[in-house]
Every structure is written in structure tokens, then in C-alpha cells.
Curated annotation (Swiss-Prot):
The gene is rsmJ. Specifically methylates the guanosine in position 1516 of 16S rRNA. It comes from Buchnera aphidicola subsp. Acyrthosiphon pisum (strain Tuc7). SUPFAM superfamilies: S-adenosyl-L-methionine-dependent methyltransferases (SSF53335). The lineage of its organism: Bacteria, Pseudomonadati, Pseudomonadota, Gammaproteobacteria, Enterobacterales. It catalyses: guanosine(1516) in 16S rRNA + S-adenosyl-L-methionine = N(2)-methylguanosine(1516) in 16S rRNA + S-adenosyl-L-homocysteine + H(+). This is Ribosomal RNA small subunit methyltransferase J.
Amino acid sequence: MKIYLKFKSYNKRICKLLQLFKLEHDQNCSMGLLINHNSLELYNRENVNQKPIKVDFTSKKNHYRCHHFRRKNEVLYRVSGIKNSYFPTVLDATAGLGNDAFIFSFLGCKVIMIERHPIVAALLKDGLQRGYQDKKIGHWLQTRLHLIVNDSLKMLEIPILQPDVIYLDPMYPFYHKKSLPKKDMQFFRQLIGHNYDSKKLLEVSRKLAKNRIIVKRPYYAKPLSEDKVNHIVTTRNHRFDIYQPF
């Protein structure tokens, strides 16, 4: 895939990632990858004032969320099915920037992220490599959070253990201005586009998961399936629809 490559600093590790995911320089691309001293960032060449995007599992936001964790306040704990010493294996079939996958792993679950877009996969891999080396979280992140680069619709063909839980957070259109995400995330959505195969992805997930499929939706959106939703957990802005496997 072609994208504008800007080298602010030479980094051998990141250069290997560019080669691994076959990312080539395109002078005319409106999106760019910034190679920093120790991180890979996606940025908008048409708006240099817009904050670049990178995967950072050691961010202040993640640190705060983990440090202030309370079972009743963490919705991913409530929907995951964690009980006592039971920590389900989770397959995040719509990894994105890995935010929710990281929280599942922090909670004690072994998590596999699947991402098909090569640029997003490169950002995730960069974030994982840096996270694995972190003194505070690296020791458990290495054993709990991993990435598979593939199409989630082909998950039945991937030689992986059958997960207890499959988590879906598909892209959805926004119908009014108040529901728009931050500008940097709007830019990220331009890169990966909307998921028009979300319903099919749910069907495939229900054939693979052992215990449950969790679908994250905006509060105003219709369920992905016409089948019965077995359980619903709501927050201020989102709804988590839980389905049983076939």
C-alpha cells in the first residue's frame, strides 16, 4: 500500500515494519506516516495542525483508566463474563487502535486482535513492540495481547484456538453533528472507511465464539442482527449487545 512517508528520525525497527506491511512512499498521498525516534504516527497532510494518531498502550489515558479501575464502573468488565478466577479468551475482530483490546488484557484476559488494513496493522504492531518493552506493563502485555494481520471475515479459516468471547466494534455512520467523534478519529475513519460487512461479521463470529459475542453500538443505532439480543448493557453514549453463539 502506498502512503506518504516522512522520516523525522531513522529507526531500524520501524523501517522493518514498513517493509513487513509493504508500505511504500507516495508523494501525492494526503495521508502520511511519520517515523519518529521511537514511534510510528499517522497524520493528515492536508491539516498539519491536526494531532497525529499513534497506538500508545502506555498513554496517560490508559494509565488513568487502569489505575482508577472499579468493577462497577468498567463496562468491558461487566460485558466480558469475567467471574472470580475465570478470564475468557477474547478475539477482538475489529481491533482499530487497540484501545478496548488493551483494557480486556488489563482485566486479565488473553486477547487476540485481528486487523486487515496494513497501515492500521503497522500502527498496532509498533504500539505492541513499544508496550512489550515498557517496565510497568510489558511483563503482562507480552502474554495477554497479540495481533493477527488478516481479514476477520476469514476468522473461521485462521488456525487459532476457539475464543470464549468475540468483540465487535464496527464503524457506524453518524447522523447528527453531536455524535461526531474528535477530528483525529474522523480522519482515522477516512483511512479505513465504513464497514459494510458488519452483519456478515456478526454471523461469522457466532459460528466461532464459545460463549458470547459482544457488539458495541452507539446508543441510537439499531442492532446488527434481527435475531434476539440476549443481553444489553448501556452506558451514556453506547450500547453493548450480547449475542449467544449459534
